[in-house]
């Protein structure tokens, strides 16, 4: 489900990837959390790639629309 949502936000003409950020669990970072703009990620099989950082899907905490502040996805 999460992979499909990210693909939709990246490729569907109704959405602009520049409007979204992904907040993910990153041990050792402030509050153990980092953010990456959706437009800068590449989807692999079971993880996202940002620069040379691999982010497993299970570490994604939320996806936020930066224009509206709406949380599109939030991990339970």
Curated annotation (Swiss-Prot):
Pfam families: MJ1316 (PF04457)
Descriptive protein name: UPF0248 protein MMP0286
Family of the protein in this entry: Belongs to the UPF0248 family.
InterPro entries: MJ1316, UPF0248
NCBIfam families according to UniProt: PRK04257.1
Coiled coil (residue ranges): none
Domain of life of the native organism: Archaea
